Amino acid sequence: MSQDKPAKPADAADRRFFKRAWVRTRRTLLLALLPLFGVGVMLYLKSEMIVLGAEAYIYGYPLVITDVTRANAALTLGPENQLRRVRQFPDASFKDVVRPNVDTLYTTAFIDTAKGPWVFEMAPNDQRYEVMPFMDGWTNVFAAPGTRTTGTQGGKFLLVGPGWQGQTPAGLTLMQSPTQMVWLIGRTQTNGTPDYGVVHRLQDGITLKSLNDWQSGKPEPSVAWQPSTAKLVPPPMQMDAMSAHTFFTRLALLMANNPPAPADGPMLVKLGRIGIAPGQPPTWSLLDGWSVSLGRWIADFTVGRELKKPRDTVRGWSTPPAILGSYGTFYNTRAVVAMVGLGANLPADATYPNTQVDAQGKPLNGSHRYRLHFGPSELPPVKAFWSVTAYGTDDALIDNPINRFALGDRDPLVFNADGSLDLWIQADRPSPDKVKNWLPVKTNSSFLLNARLYWPKDAALNGNWGMPAVERLE
């Protein structure tokens, strides 16, 4: 029976062979790892560029997306410095603005204050609630004439830009924008489609003229204009596709005429450290540009994480921050709102509780049926009106067979005998006794609910009142 022999020790030649092989292997590994090591060193050396690039992107996002929205509007809605009176509600095909409302008809305009001064006039209106917020390029509301602030008697206002030092004519109230670019997003209460005639007359009582035309008594100008037939990319998608160099170049140029607020001084210092200043686009080296680009993607991730992380909720509903429309140096909040709710009102004019979950914290989905129950004394506390709107995951209205996108206090809702109210939220048509209170959603699709409280009472703003939980029925 044979036996295995012990292995023969390697001789000197074998040892030299293995030594040379190890040297070659080590050299190959070092050469392979050297680029990674070099990248690590470069990342370390450019870490400030990366971090500041992220901060700068979050800081500048609202100004740039507002300008992108302005450019789109000039092609699809009408020229600058001319009011556009929206005469009907949006439908499910509307994608220009995230979470559009179907409670009001808009009167809007992008206004270039450098071509002013401008006179904005509102006729007396004691029939419908209205609010006319003027937003600067950074998405802060600097004036909001309307029912809450100026009453029902209307008003005449002189709109000017930064640095204007002229004399305000008698009879006009001064509104001075801190930026050259101004966006008016006026809203007039509309009680369903049968109310269009009344609201159209009220809209026609809102005018925008140059000061010279107003003083000479000329009518509101009407510029011949043909909307673009091209399918435009929505502003958020344009922002996603924009390179870091294009973004920061646009930001620098915009800041020349839309100056940052005085409180933004420390941020301007940071921008300067990565080669960005008002009116001065960046001229980066390849490595610096790559570093800032990485920072931009980190910023996208940061904001995306901010959007996804759990909010402080009451019965599943979260309420936008009290600084909405007046952000100060809360740049993260300002950027998040610009991404998901560009053009939001001041909380005193409207507040927007929203939810994506039911009472058990499970995501809302059209594969289930839900009930939203308001007790007899639990209806939204408002001085104007309230509604609840359903949106898909794309933040657009949900297509449905009855073209109903919201329910609210101006609808012919059916109340229970005790004065309570049930809203039925589901994809399939409910029984006939529930149809008037039915808010349709899409089968097997996730959705969210957005309440709107116009001219909310204090209880809705200080936390003494909150929306009821969404009850899953099956």
Where are these regions (language model features)?
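A compositional/structural signature for long, glycine/proline-rich flexible linkers
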Residues: 2-474
